[in-house]
């Protein structure tokens, strides 16, 4: 059922999940939770080989690939 609701929201442009801090809105709660990190000052993903730190796991993975740490 949830997959169908998500699918229909994508087709009809419905974005019921809204950020309380800015005008961002999205189709599901996990996307909103990811977006909320952009308002935080918490950089929980850190490179063990340099001073790089990020809010997002995928950004750290890209960093590690780019610099071959």
Curated annotation (Swiss-Prot):
The keyword Electron transport does not apply. GO terms for biological process: segmentation. The keyword Nucleus applies. Keywords: Developmental protein, DNA-binding, Gap protein, Metal-binding, Nucleus, Repeat, Zinc, Zinc-finger. It is found in: Nucleus. It comes from the Eukaryota. One of its GO terms (cellular component) is nucleus. A zinc finger (C2H2-type) spans 1-11, 17-39, 45-69. One of its GO terms (molecular function) is DNA binding. Gap class segmentation protein that controls development of head structures. Belongs to the hunchback C2H2-type zinc-finger protein family. This is Protein hunchback. The gene is hb.
């Amino acid at each position: 059922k949830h997959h169908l609701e998500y699918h229909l929201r994508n087709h009809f442009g419905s974005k019921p999940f809204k950020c309380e801090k800015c005008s961002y809105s999205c189709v599901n709660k996990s996307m909103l939770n990811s977006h909320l990190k952009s308002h935080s000052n918490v950089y929980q993903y850190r490179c063990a080989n340099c001073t790089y730190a990020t809010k997002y796991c995928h950004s750290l993975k890209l960093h590690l690939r780019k610099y071959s740490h």
